[in-house]
Amino acid sequence: MAETSSLISGVAQRYAGSLFELALDAKSVAAVEKDLDRFEALLSGSEDLKRLISSPVFSSEDQLHAIGALADKAGIKGLVGNFLRVVARNRRLFALPGIIAAFRKIAAEHRGEVSADVISAHELSAAQQNELKATLKGVAGKDVTINVTVDPSILGGLIVKMGSRQIDTSLRTKLSSLKLALKEVG
C-alpha cells in the first residue's frame, strides 16, 4: 500500500511540476488554478467520474474521450484542457487528485504562501477557516493556504500538518493517550 501511495505521489509531483512550469511560462498560474478547482469540484460531485479516473477497466481512448468531452462542457479549455487529455492519454488519471493538490502547493510556494493540510471532524465555517489561517500565519510568519478535509473518525478537534510540523488536537488522539495512561496505571 505504501508503495502505491509513493508511486502516485511521485507521478503527481512530476505532472504538477510540469503543469506549473507551463502555466508560469504562459503567465496563467491563477487561471490554471481556477480550472483545476472547477475540475476538482466536478470530481468531488460525481461518483461516475471518480470511477472513470480510478478504474483500469476503461480503455485509454474511452478515458480520453470522456475527459475531453467533460472538459469542453465545463469550459475547461487551453492549458488545463490539453493537460487533462495528456494525463488521460498516458493513463495517469488515477493521480489527478494528487496532481491538483501538488499544483496548489507549488503555486502557493511560488506566491510565498505556506500550505497547511487540516483534518477536521466536521466542516469548518468560513469564519473558523479565517481564524485558523490567521493563527497559522502567526506561527509561520507567512500567508497560509489551508486544504480542509473532513474525517469524522477523529471525533473532534483538528489535525494540522504544515511543512514538517503536525499538531494533533483530535479527540481520538486524546482518548488514545488516556487509554494508554490508564493501562500503565492499572
UniProtKB/Swiss-Prot annotation:
Keywords: ATP synthesis, Cell inner membrane, Cell membrane, CF(1), Hydrogen ion transport, Ion transport, Membrane, Transport. GO terms for molecular function: proton-transporting ATP synthase activity, rotational mechanism. Pfam families: OSCP. InterPro entries: ATP_synth_OSCP/delta_N_sf (IPR026015), ATPase_OSCP/d_CS (IPR020781), ATPase_OSCP/dsu (IPR000711). One of its GO terms (cellular component) is proton-transporting ATP synthase complex. It is found in: Cell inner membrane. SUPFAM superfamilies: N-terminal domain of the delta subunit of the F1F0-ATP synthase. It comes from the Bacteria. It is a peripheral membrane protein. HAMAP family: ATP_synth_delta_bact. F(1)F(0) ATP synthase produces ATP from ADP in the presence of a proton or sodium gradient. F-type ATPases consist of two structural domains, F(1) containing the extramembraneous catalytic core and F(0) containing the membrane proton channel, linked together by a central stalk and a peripheral stalk. During catalysis, ATP synthesis in the catalytic domain of F(1) is coupled via a rotary mechanism of the central stalk subunits to proton translocation. Belongs to the ATPase delta chain family. F-type ATPases have 2 components, F(1) - the catalytic core - and F(0) - the membrane proton channel. F(1) has five subunits: alpha(3), beta(3), gamma(1), delta(1), epsilon(1). F(0) has three main subunits: a(1), b(2) and c(10-14). The alpha and beta chains form an alternating ring which encloses part of the gamma chain. F(1) is attached to F(0) by a central stalk formed by the gamma and epsilon chains, while a peripheral stalk is formed by the delta and b chains. This is ATP synthase subunit delta. It comes from Brucella anthropi (strain ATCC 49188 / DSM 6882 / CCUG 24695 / JCM 21032 / LMG 3331 / NBRC 15819 / NCTC 12168 / Alc 37). The lineage of its organism: Bacteria, Pseudomonadati, Pseudomonadota, Alphaproteobacteria, Hyphomicrobiales.
